[in-house]
């Protein structure tokens, strides 16, 4: 079982490469980049990834499962948690790139406005093509992720 080799094989499968219109939004206590509109290509890529890499996933501990169950999950999300180790996959997947840690409610609006203004000022920030996958590792819940591998996605060739 070689995760890096599987990442490269997965990325080499020709597919429609997703592109999203990014937007800065508040997600619960965090602020994140999200897709302004649904992307079937991105949803398919995410679903394919969940299934392709599930064999590398560490099973949830009873404590981790209990914490997730306390979040008010739907029946489908509980089934996803038990089968895939995470409740927000497939129909419940929502693309996001978290920009902040938790922000108190009284500050969240002003931080959101600031980040939206900064983001809007970036030239070319209104289309975000997804062309690479990164393999990240987090050694402990409280530590940052670090990149341990990357692979370029392979686009479906247009008929000539």
What are these regions (language model features)?
Residues 1-160:
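Histidine-dependent nucleotide/RNA phosphoesterase domain, centered on the 2H-phosphoesterase fold
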């Amino acid at each position: 079982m070689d995760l890096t080799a599987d990442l490269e094989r997965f990325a080499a499968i020709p597919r429609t490469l997703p592109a999203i219109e990014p937007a800065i939004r508040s997600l619960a206590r965090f602020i994140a980049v999200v897709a302004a509109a649904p992307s079937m290509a991105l949803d398919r890529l995410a679903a394919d990834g969940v299934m392709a890499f599930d064999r590398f996933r560490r099973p949830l501990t009873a404590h981790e499962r209990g914490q997730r169950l306390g979040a008010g999950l739907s029946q489908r999300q509980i089934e996803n948690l038990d089968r895939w180790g995470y409740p927000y996959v497939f129909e419940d997947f929502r693309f996001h790139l978290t920009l902040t840690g938790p922000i108190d409610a009284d500050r969240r609006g002003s931080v959101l406005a600031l980040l939206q203004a900064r983001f809007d000022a970036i030239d070319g920030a209104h289309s975000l093509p997804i062309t690479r996958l990164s393999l990240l590792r987090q050694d402990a819940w409280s530590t940052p992720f670090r990149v341990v591998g990357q692979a370029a996605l392979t686009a479906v060739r247009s008929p000539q």
